[in-house]
């Protein structure tokens, strides 16, 4: 029947009528051409119209089949009943007696009332219950088929029947309902309650009603009709038939083809089997990058697309030059006839997994050696595959301007797509990344948490200064043009500045004051709260009692001072003689002029820009700040071109949309440093700068109400001590102007204020200038260095090494970081420390994201504060010519300097803390270790240095540590109060009514500061001093704190000739480190406070949530040097806690 119906259905379709058209034509002629009175023609048409809905609707056809089968079964039951009723009357009494006897014992009756005698009637007693059970099976078959096609899985349907069996057992056993009362209302109510509750959990309303109604009806039929069985058995037989029917439905659903009609709501995307497969098998999808530029290039290739379907459409020509690719195909692919394609992303993931395994200290040495060898092989392949980009022509100078096109930004980003994916996958987290979660930490508590991994691609931040045409065609005032900030349609946030030809290199001071044009789409941290922020938000300004402002500073700030997120250059006036604001390309985000096409190129042919680019650079930083949100700068690519502005502005004007500034803010005058520039009454305290526990709060008290100048004064002393003013020809007045404006931009909040910025600046200066035991130096003496840096390509005429005037090398067994880090990178680290918390609102990143602050929206909830600090500080620097203290840096050096500063600021995001620590540990534990000639390694060291300086409070002496702890606690409590006022859940450790200061500090030291100090100290970068055995005789009994020193080429005990005998083979050398000593002492102090609080509260057992803290506490006490492998330049150990020296 089904085959015939399907054939009829196919025959009814227009396109499936078969090859013989003659019969069809005759049929059509009869239906159309027949007379209306012809009964044969009219009957044919009416039959076709009546069967057409049945053919097209699977529901109607299924209902018709179920109905016909039910009618047949009913007729069969009727025939069985008639046969039984026509039996001989003589056997009724015997059958009745036998029925009563069997009914009393329980079991199957041998025959019905009036059973027929003889052998011919022996099958009739079994025919009626078999027919009834078959009917129940068929009914559940159709119901199961309906449920399966609706998306219900077979185990769920069987579970519903199990719920029915449980209800029956509850009715019969627990409630004690007799056989005669199974159809009573209480029994039916209990059973329907069980079934309905189970159905409500797994089925939708329509399917649930169908299931309950049909099951209850069939149970009633079974209780009434199955007279051959005991009453208590009848429901279970019905459920058994139901299970068989569901199994048959599952089997039939797999065999029968799916209907071509519209599928149910859960099946409209495919067949039932495919849907169940998708539900049972989780789908792991790779994040893909779509680009209109890449799509356009791929569409224009015209050849076969050699790529995996799960990877982005990036042609090989983007990964390496055309000539290199043709050469590789000629040398390799021509030999075998096929080209070997390597999946770079998979190799990157494998390299990351191996690096993660290497971080495990419990691995055997042979396993570590094998894994390290595989990691080196993968690193070579990754470098070979991913960083094949055309080199810059050494004869091309950076003074040339390139054409600004629509696709320039997209091409540059697509070329960096693969390395960005590698940078995102290579650094493993300190805690293993499992499934779709990653480890992170909140900046508030320092406790590690788990967050869902982001599903969006990381956005890059690119801020690009731009040179306008020459002064011969434009206004010669290089700082008159306004700063324009816009959001481009590319994947990065571009802040384009319209600056004239001699931007920061030949900046001139303006001659007359005037209005200041400005567009500021970002809220200002001035006295008025920004849009979208509550009135009580710290963005509206928090007056601090501890650090009052002087009237002089308050007067200079004014009601509309430049404490905004974006700053602009002042213009003399708004007269018509001034050229109009440059137009910004809406495609690439770069400004271009609409002036005369005959305007000459910008004047960039000075001596500073004449030197050619090095051709032997292995790794050169990108010309712009182009990095992912992970702030992982290990894979800095060689820059293939300087993306300058267009040389002919009007040639591409028709192809670029325009963006016109909408908002203008007028500022009167910049904030300048007051006289005298250098305060002369601070020498007594400034002489203590070379101590780790610098009395910074005493300095605040000495400055008094002028404490707003603390950052500029300390910055001047440190720069002057390092000789940076002479090395880079920094003008003192511009330097003091900018740093004074920078310190004014810090808000008066308890912790993240200008005093904290000064403390971090002093900490990075101390860590980079103090003697470090056993640290090898790149240069032999002060000032002697090679002609050029092997990695960056900068000559040491401007990139030499500087040392502190207070640095005195005791002997050749000490070194310092300033002897291994070039001066430009060192100055970038100091400037980043001063900028790193500029305009901090006193709230955490999590709070800004939770309240949908404008900064969180602007930076896509990623490193919100860190991006804001860097952008606002650089915007301040570029806003006025009076702030340009880098006037003598050439264009390449300035871009490199800016890149380093931004990377260092973004590294202070504690959410990426574990990634940095794990990456640094992997670098230190590598065979090569830290390569001081590699710019990437030096940048990683600088990032770790500023991270340690940013959280150095627990590593200070007790008095300073308690002062900083009081400040951070006050700031946390203010955020907790605001969260409570906004109806938000109060963050951990921020509830003023339930202070947990000791737990906060103990956990912060255990999870954040301790591992960071341990990693930094294990790399041999922590300042300290050698201690002889005679100086620590009381502490040498502990064997765990003693290690034998390995052979190093710089030790006195090792002879120059490796074959010559040495005076001493081993000598136990120990190091005293004041920083780690303070850290251990403060950690023990907070542990004792926690124990005392627990004793006072009557808690003898430690809380469950502090068990991991205790484990970390024990680990943090072991901050000592590991035994170095052969060939390492340092092998020592750290002293146990001792009294201060």
Swiss-Prot record:
Compositional bias annotation for Acidic residues: 1029-1046
EC number of this enzyme: 3.1.4.17
Binding site for Mn(2+): 756, 836-837, 950
Alphabetical UniProt keywords: cAMP, cGMP, Cytoplasm, Hydrolase, Isopeptide bond, Magnesium, Manganese, Membrane, Metal-binding, Phosphoprotein, Transmembrane, Transmembrane helix, Ubl conjugation
Stretches the record annotates as Disordered: 1-41, 89-111, 262-309, 433-479, 504-643, 1024-1062, 1098-1141
PROSITE patterns: PDEASE_I_1 (PS00126), PDEASE_I_2 (PS51845)
Region Interaction with SLFN12, residue ranges: 669-1141
GO molecular function terms attached to this record: 3',5'-cGMP-inhibited cyclic-nucleotide phosphodiesterase activity; 3',5'-cyclic-AMP phosphodiesterase activity; 3',5'-cyclic-GMP phosphodiesterase activity; 3',5'-cyclic-nucleotide phosphodiesterase activity; cyclic-nucleotide phosphodiesterase activity; estrogen binding; metal ion binding; nuclear estrogen receptor activity
Occurrences of domain PDEase (ranges): 674-1093
Modified residues (Phosphoserine): 310, 492, 520, 524, 533, 1033
Swiss-Prot/TrEMBL catalytic activity: a nucleoside 3',5'-cyclic phosphate + H2O = a nucleoside 5'-phosphate + H(+); 3',5'-cyclic AMP + H2O = AMP + H(+); 3',5'-cyclic GMP + H2O = GMP + H(+); 3',5'-cyclic UMP + H2O = UMP + H(+)
Localization: Membrane; Cytoplasm, Cytosol
Domain of life where this protein originates: Eukaryota
Bias (Low complexity): 433-445
Primary enzyme class: hydrolase
PANTHER family: CYCLIC NUCLEOTIDE PHOSPHODIESTERASE (PTHR11347)
Family designation: Belongs to the cyclic nucleotide phosphodiesterase family. PDE3 subfamily.
Protein name as it appears in the record: cGMP-inhibited 3',5'-cyclic phosphodiesterase 3A
Phylogenetic lineage: Eukaryota, Metazoa, Chordata, Craniata, Vertebrata
Gene: Pde3a
């Amino acid at each position: 029947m089904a085959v015939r119906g399907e054939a009829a259905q196919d025959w009814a379709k227009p396109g499936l009528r078969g090859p013989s058209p003659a019969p069809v034509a005759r049929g059509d002629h009869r239906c159309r051409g027949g007379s209306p009175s012809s009964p044969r023609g009219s009957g044919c048409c009416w039959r076709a119209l009546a069967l057409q809905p049945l053919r097209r609707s699977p529901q109607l056809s299924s209902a018709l089949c179920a109905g016909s089968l039910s009618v047949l079964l009913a007729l069969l039951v009727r025939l069985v009943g008639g046969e039984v009723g026509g039996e001989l009357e003589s056997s009724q009494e015997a059958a009745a007696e036998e029925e009563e006897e069997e009914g009393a014992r329980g079991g199957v009756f041998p025959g019905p009332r009036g059973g027929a005698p003889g052998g011919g009637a022996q099958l009739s007693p079994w025919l009626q219950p078999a027919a009834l059970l078959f009917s129940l099976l068929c009914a559940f078959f159709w119901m199961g088929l309906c449920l399966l096609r609706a998306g219900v899985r077979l185990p769920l349907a069987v579970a519903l029947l199990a719920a029915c069996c449980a209800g029956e057992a509850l009715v019969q056993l627990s409630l004690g309902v007799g056989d005669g009362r199974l159809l009573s209302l209480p029994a039916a109510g209990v059973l329907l309650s069980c079934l309905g509750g189970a159905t409500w959990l797994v089925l939708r309303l329509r399917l649930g009603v169908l299931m309950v109604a049909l099951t209850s009806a069939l149970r009633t039929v079974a209780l009434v009709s199955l007279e051959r069985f005991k009453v208590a058995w009848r429901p279970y037989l019905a459920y058994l038939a139901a299970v068989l029917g569901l199994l048959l439905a599952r089997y039939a659903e797999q065999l029968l083809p799916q209907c071509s009609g519209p599928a149910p709501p859960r099946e409209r995307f495919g067949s039932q089997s495919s849907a169940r497969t998708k539900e049972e098998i989780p789908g792991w999808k790779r994040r893909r990058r779509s680009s209109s530029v890449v799509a356009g290039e791929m569409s224009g290739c015209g050849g076969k697309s050699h790529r995996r379907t799960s990877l982005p459409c990036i042609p090989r020509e983007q990964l390496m030059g055309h000539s290199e690719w043709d050469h590789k195909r000629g040398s390799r692919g021509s030999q075998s006839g096929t080209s070997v394609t390597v999946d770079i992303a998979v190799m990157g993931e494998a390299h990351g997994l191996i690096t993660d395994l290497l971080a495990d200290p419990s691995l055997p040495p042979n396993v570590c050696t094998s894994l390290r060898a595989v990691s080196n092989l993968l690193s070579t392949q990754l470098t070979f595959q991913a960083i094949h980009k055309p080199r810059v022509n050494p004869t091309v100078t950076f003074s040339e301007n390139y054409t600004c096109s629509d696709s320039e930004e997209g091409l540059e980003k697509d070329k960096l797509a693969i390395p960005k994916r590698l940078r995102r996958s290579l650094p493993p987290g300190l805690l293993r990344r499992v499934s779709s979660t990653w480890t992170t930490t909140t900046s508030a508590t320092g406790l590690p948490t788990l967050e869902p991994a982001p599903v969006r691609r990381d956005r890059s931040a690119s801020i690009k200064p731009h040179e306008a045409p020459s002064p011969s065609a434009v206004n010669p005032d290089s700082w008159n043009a306004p700063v324009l900030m816009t959001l481009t349609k590319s994947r990065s946030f571009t802040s384009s500045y319209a600056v004239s030809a001699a931007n920061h290199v030949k900046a001139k001071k303006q001659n007359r004051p005037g209005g200041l044009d400005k567009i500021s789409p970002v809220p200002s941290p001035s006295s008025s709260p920004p849009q979208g922020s509550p009135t009580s938000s710290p963005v509206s300004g928090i007056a601090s009692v501890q650090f009052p402002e002087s009237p002089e500073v308050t007067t200079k700030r004014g009601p509309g001072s430049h404490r905004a997120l974006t700053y602009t250059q002042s213009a003399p006036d708004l007269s018509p003689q001034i050229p109009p604001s440059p137009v910004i390309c809406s495609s690439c985000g770069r400004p271009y002029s609409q002036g005369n096409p005959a305007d000459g190129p910008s004047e960039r042919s000075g001596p500073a820009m004449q030197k050619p680019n090095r051709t032997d650079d292995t790794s050169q930083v990108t010309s712009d700040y182009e990095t992912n949100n992970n702030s992982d700068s290990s894979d800095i690519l060689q820059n293939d071109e300087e993306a300058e502005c267009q040389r002919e502005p009007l040639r591409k004007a028709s192809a670029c949309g325009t963006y016109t500034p909408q908002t203008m803010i007028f500022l009167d005058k910049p904030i300048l440093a007051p006289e005298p520039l250098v305060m002369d009454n601070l020498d007594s305290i400034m002489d203590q700068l070379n101590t780790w526990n610098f009395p910074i709060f005493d300095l605040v008290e000495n400055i008094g109400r002028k404490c707003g100048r603390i950052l500029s004064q300390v910055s001047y002393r440190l720069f002057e001590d390092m000789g940076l003013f002479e090395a880079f020809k920094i003008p003192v007045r511009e330097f003091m102007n900018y740093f004074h404006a920078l310190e004014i931009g810090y808000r008066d909040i308890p912790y993240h204020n200008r005093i904290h910025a000064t403390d971090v600046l002093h900490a990075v200066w101390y860590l980079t200038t103090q003697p470090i035991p056993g640290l090898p130096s790149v240069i032999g003496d002060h000032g002697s260095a090679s002609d050029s840096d092997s990695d960056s390509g900068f000559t040491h005429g401007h990139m030499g090494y500087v040392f502190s005037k207070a640095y005195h090398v005791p002997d050749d067994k000490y070194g310092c970081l300033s002897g291994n880090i070039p001066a430009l990178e060192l100055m970038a680290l100091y400037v980043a420390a001063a900028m790193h918390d500029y305009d901090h609102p006193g709230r955490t990143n999590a709070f800004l994201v939770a309240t949908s602050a404008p900064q969180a929206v602007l930076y896509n909830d990623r490193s919100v504060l860190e991006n804001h600090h860097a952008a606002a500080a650089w915007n301040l620097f570029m806003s006025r010519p009076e702030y340009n203290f880098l006037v003598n840096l050439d264009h390449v050096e300035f871009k490199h300097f800016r890149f380093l500063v931004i990377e260092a600021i973004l590294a202070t995001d504690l959410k990426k803390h574990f990634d940095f620590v794990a990456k640094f540990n992997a670098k230190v534990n590598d065979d090569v270790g830290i390569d001081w000639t590699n710019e990437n390694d030096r940048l990683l060291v600088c990032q770790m240095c500023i991270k340690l300086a940013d959280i150095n409070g627990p590593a200070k002496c007790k008095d300073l540590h308690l002062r900083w702890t009081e400040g951070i606690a006050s700031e946390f409590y203010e955020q907790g109060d605001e969260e409570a006022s906004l109806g938000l859940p109060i963050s951990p450790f921020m509830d003023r009514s339930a202070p947990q200061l000791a737990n906060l500090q103990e956990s912060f030291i255990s999870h954040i500061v301790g591992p960071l100090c341990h990693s930094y100290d294990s790399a041999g970068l922590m300042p300290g001093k050698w201690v002889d055995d005679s100086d620590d005789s009381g502490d040498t009994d502990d064997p765990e704190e003693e290690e034998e020193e390995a052979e190093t080429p710089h030790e006195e005990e090792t002879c120059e000739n490796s074959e010559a005998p040495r005076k001493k083979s081993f000598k136990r050398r120990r190091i005293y480190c004041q920083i780690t000593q303070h850290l251990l002492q403060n950690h023990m102090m907070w542990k004792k406070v926690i124990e005392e609080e627990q004793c006072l509260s009557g808690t003898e057992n430690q809380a469950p949530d502090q068990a991991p803290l205790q484990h970390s506490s024990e680990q943090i006490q072991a901050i000592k040097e590991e035994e170095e492998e052969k060939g390492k330049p340092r092998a020592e150990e750290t002293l146990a806690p001792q009294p201060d020296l």
